Amino acid sequence: MRFLVIGRGWTGNKVHDALLNRGHTVEFISHHEVDGALRDLPSFDWVVNCAGVTGSPNVDACEFDKENTVIGNAVFPIILHEKLKNTRSKLAHFSSGCIYVGDIQGSYAEPNFFGSIYSISKGISDIYLKDRAMVFRIRMPFTGVNEKKNYLTKVYNYAKTAKLIDAGQNSLTDIDEAVSVACDLMEEDAPLGPYNLVNQGSINMHDLAQIMGIEPEWFTPEEFRVATAAGRSTCTIPDTGRMRPVKEALADAVAKMKLT
């Protein structure tokens, strides 16, 4: 199969490498290079959008760059889909589960969290693409490699320099597992629609701190609201059944990080 992977960030690199390792032909571009690459659209089986604005070092940064956040997370995926109309290429889009708050049930639910421009922008494209693309939702992605986009790396760093907040149970994503499942779904030509690529079960921050072997200080909810510019999504969403239990995946990732 022939793939066009858009977005040279953390997720895009993982998707690119995974597809190459499976023997596929892969063209890898940044979102700035899309117009030129799309001239060759008829030859791609899948266009995989991994581009997006997440904010650095965290989602608070999006509040101070609303225009680019909306363009990257809402406008760009919709325009990309429109460019694919009347071609043989199908669109796969990496989205976010941080469009929800609470315990979400059922195969599909409308976004219900609007506490940050990041979540709002992701929710817009999620709604538009739900029947038009394969939508891969991930949450708080982690891996066993110590790198800045790794959720576990962020937690380690926050525990050293600030405090943590435990707002309740969350679904999380082992990003390497998620990428593997995403590749499986595209190879299988699975139905278009949303796929929650989260590990089975959920975890709260106190339990995560115990797995990680850290003893952080904790924000009160009031302190956290004062310290942050954006609200945070706290939610559990149904999993696909294709990924490991979250506590098993986290323990494995933490063990690998301590070895490197």
How would you name each of these model-derived features?
Residues 1-22:
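N-terminal Rossmann NAD(P)H-binding glycine-rich loop of SDR-like oxidoreductase domains
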Residues 10, 203-205, 220-248:
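Active-site loop of classical SDR/Rossmann-like NAD(P)-dependent oxidoreductases
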Residues 34-72:
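NAD(P)H-binding glycine-rich loop region in Rossmannoid oxidoreductase-like domains
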Residues 61-92:
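NAD(P)-cofactor binding segment of oxidoreductase domains
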Residues 64-71, 75, 98-136, 140-143:
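Catalytic helix-loop patch of NAD(P)-dependent Rossmann-fold dehydrogenases
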Residues 115, 127-170, 177:
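NAD(P)-dependent short-chain dehydrogenase/reductase
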Residues 181-228, 254-258:
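Mid/C-terminal beta-alpha module of Rossmann-like enzyme folds, strongest
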Residues 244-260:
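Amphipathic terminal alpha-helices
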